[in-house]
């Protein structure tokens, strides 16, 4: 089967479509050929793939070939079996007939003979030539076609279709497409099954000696080609994948040694996308193929199918993996391959993949993640070719022009040198080139970095090239001549990405003779020739590469340093651009740094600065300070050349922020010097700069500063300076940020004067104005150095005191300041709640309680309200306040005295009131104290007594006085507490009178009851009564009938005195005015009380304490004596209630009878209308509802004994004992009215009766 390999490849190259055979029985093909070809390709075809699943194929091309064509006739049976993929997949039989007898006798037997082959997939196309106007011909055609369908079609399968040449086409072409598709599907399934069976048989023998890979390949690729022609690209790709796996399993079978290949012309150029670059007959070897060409052929077939599937991403992914794995295979055979064959092949392969996949890729067609991954692979391909290209450039002497950056050093120092069997020798006529190379090497000088930074150049080689090249020369042995080491230390050979085990000795036996290789020892002057110099090694490698490289474009890029830089720049830009569009944007930024180095070399400082900024931002963000130290000086130099003062200053600060071990002290001082010089130079505009990595700050150790709402303070902050020397800050500000609301921003605290920061730790104190309540953390430190405005938002951990350079950039969660919410810092309250004596100098107590806050230097403003004045002539006493409530809450509300630095020995002090305010003493700053202020409540109103029948109600507000207090305290008296306290002043006694008895001689016994109104012992020394007109004393002196003085009245108790009085009958009411309208009760008394409890002995500022004790007090009260109730003018009587009683909700009539007992004198009358009496009914609205008139006039004759009844309708509202409504006569004095009953009384109101509507019968 392997003998047919050439014919197989020829047939495969000539077939690109499925074939449908046309059996033209009636010479109809010339007529219908054009119509058939117009309807190609098949628009909608459903085929079956290898797994027997239906697959929709769009636009399936089919080629129609007559069965009489030589392409189908000139084949031997063995060829048909071997190349079955090119056989027809469908047979179309073209017939026409208009005579039924002709069909039966001639056409039908012929058709039976044609379709009797079971292997064919056939159907019949009946072509009607009858014109629509010829009815007879049309009828005959229909009869013939009907008979044709009966004879050749069945229920399982319809094998006939009709094409009307002159009539409408109808759905013929759809029917034709379905029938062709059905035939192709059946044929495809049968042939695929045949190939699978044959392939399975061969696969089972692949580890046997009789195994022949060529036979397996022909069958496998035939099946793949069938699927490819049927546009089943997925199945075809799967076949090629299986073919590749099988080849890799069998290519290196032990006992079979095959040539690797790669010795032909242009083999250095990868043919990953050109499957027909070499005929298969040229790469066949025994029963298999050479690995070098065949693996590329398989990948080219796979990539062709992937491009048809519109998967350039998969081509790039597979291509990158293939390049890596194939490069390892090249490494295994490197000793027999041309010099640097691996590097050249990798470069061409990567560039070919990049060009092909980029041309097939369209943005936005695939998903975004796949698109990004595609660009990542493009970047990888560019990077791989870039590294290999740099290796070639270094081998020919361009290493001095390659930037010794961390990236280039990492790539090249891990990439091994080429390992030919013998290093290329120097041509005899290359002396001039060697001289030129030596001159270039001597003139090459490393670029001096800015700030005079001295750095050891990063290596670009895995080991010393001079040693490696000389060691691989055939006539030298390692270490014979010291010159080969060139005075350098010995390095271990590196192993890069493509490093692999040593080449087997069997592969180093003999290389096939070829004119291109430079691996031969060459001509030497003696058996032991001298070692090659470095320039000679470069020249020898360059000549060897000229023989290896067949690509003129690649060869041109290595011909001069300018072309090399251009190609290097293009590869770097391609990699960077693709990485920027992928996930690996950091790789693109790093490559931007390599582009920046080239731009800097050629004076394009603006482009270099832009790229360097991206690289520095990446390195800083990742924390790669070693790499940042390599690139940042280059950026600073570009900015200085471009006169970018802000950028240059920022770069200097960033250089200072790096680890101290990366630069020497002298270099760091140079950085600081540049910053200070620029800051104080004549810059156009102030430069804002973030120095967060250089200046950090933290709060001091310990608890946060505690302040109350509205209090100022001093805040100490630790600032860490990363400058190597002292630096003076013109201004420094610190921002505090509230933890509960960070959106508002913080308040800036400014330092009062210039600040000098020493290297390391510094403690700075800021004046803290009052802050809002909440917790505060450090926000931002800002300041200014000359024209430089700096800002830092980094925080230090606040390490141990001895680590002055310990800095961190983590934001602390511990607050530095806590301002408590508004709370009570002090409490002012009245010391006494009971009443004091009115019109007498009394001590009023004010309790001052500090609540966990110092009152040192506090000022209390005292302002009395109306009716109250302070006795200025007497000092204000201040005492320590110690009561039970205060002691209990001291642990929560007060600061202990021993915690205060103020001495606690003093317990009292006399303070002077100045301009209505007093200043607290220091001893009272942290303890509760009480202030005794002498005041006097003024009242010109004379106290009035009341009758026991109608007692007067005491008006509490009448004796109330207020004192407005305002306390200013705090460090700057910024805290203000205001409160108004009330004090109750009253008379010592409440006087009540009643007539106890009336003697037969007209003498009245008047009982005067004295009720103590204060919490003190009142001592009654003497009492006398000044009677009003119309009354005289039974005794001439006006004293009580019995005297038991001094009489002590305890707090809240009662006492009584009795007077004997008579009516003054000699007094005439006509023509005489009243001289004393009311009686005056005089009481001389003393008082024993405590000012801490209430009323007490008055304060007299004009006398000494001894005089005050001897001075008695006099209390006067006015009492009204009514005319005796036994001699009234009118009487009001409450008539009895109904016998059934009162009930809630029941309407009743209340009645009062008014009767005139005697005529009313003119002097006793209130109005002149004596025949009318004004009445008024008073009732509690909560207990009674009045239905009638509450107020009105009734007629009452002036004659003695006349009477009238007043009736009022009302409804009781509540049950129980309540006071009934009362009838009063407003225009008649109480002395002229007698009531029955005489005083208030109660009536019983029953609950309402139960209603039957709400009752349930009891069963």
UniProtKB/Swiss-Prot annotation:
The keyword Translocase does not apply. It comes from the Eukaryota. Residues 479-526 are annotated as: Disordered. The modification N-acetylalanine is found at residue 2. Disruption phenotype: Cytokinesis-defective and seedling-lethal phenotype. It is found in: Golgi apparatus, trans-Golgi network; Early endosome. InterPro entries: TRAPP_II_complex_TRAPPC10_C (IPR022233), TRAPPC10/Trs130 (IPR045126), TRAPPC10/Trs130_N (IPR056913). One of its GO terms (cellular component) is early endosome. The keyword Acetylation applies. One of its GO terms (biological process) is Golgi vesicle transport. Keywords: Acetylation, Endosome, Golgi apparatus, Transport. Its main location: Golgi. PANTHER family: EPILEPSY HOLOPROSENCEPHALY CANDIDATE 1/TMEM1, TRAFFICKING PROTEIN PARTICLE COMPLEX SUBUNIT 10. Belongs to the TMEM1 family. Specific subunit of the TRAPP II complex, a highly conserved vesicle tethering complex that is required for the proper transport of proteins in post-Golgi trafficking pathways to the growing cell plate in mitotic active cells. Required for the polarized and selective transport of PIN2, but not PIN1, to the plasma membrane. Not required for ER-to-Golgi as well as biosynthetic and endocytic vacuolar transport. Part of the multisubunit TRAPP (transport protein particle) II complex composed of BET3, BET5, TRS20, TRS23, TRS31, TRS33, TRS65, TRS85, TRS120 and TRS130. This is Trafficking protein particle complex II-specific subunit 130 homolog.
